[in-house]
Amino acid sequence: MKIGLISHDGKKASMVAFVMKRLDFFNREDVDIVTTGTTGTMILHAGVEKVQRVSSGPLGGDAEIGAMVARKEMDAIIFFRDPLDKHPHEPDIQMLMRLCDVHDVPLATNYKAGHIVIEYLSKK
């Protein structure tokens, strides 16, 4: 299964904590992780063994992951958004969220929702 992990700058520490708490899941043989740039670097340092990194969000990474959703290559997206900050690539973020809805791909935008998605996926 393929899971997208994305986090805004203000949520990167939360994403790292989230991943570290679930390293056994994220390092499973059947789990592939796709991340945006800096998030991927931080997750690798947190102990995830294999990560496919795309561009950073503002440079098109959210759109790249959105394209994977549209091609039905993603099983879930965990996107820790910072709703209190402005993002120049907001149209890409909205497009990614819309594509998840269109293609029925689970999308978690906070820690607790992410936990629920991982619990669901771990039973697949």
Show where each model-derived region lies:
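Glycine-rich, flexible N-terminal cofactor/catalytic loop recognition
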Residues: V16-I33
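Short internal beta-strands
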Residues: E29-T39, I43
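General beta-strand structural signal in soluble alpha/beta enzymes
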Residues: V34-T36, R53-S55, F79, L107-Y111
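Short hydrophobic/aromatic-enriched beta-strand-loop microsegments
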Residues: E49-G60
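Mid-chain, well-packed structural core segment of small domains
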Residues: L59-R98
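Ser/Thr/Gly-rich flexible loops in soluble cytosolic domains mediating phosphotransfer, phosphorylation
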Residues: D85, I93-K124
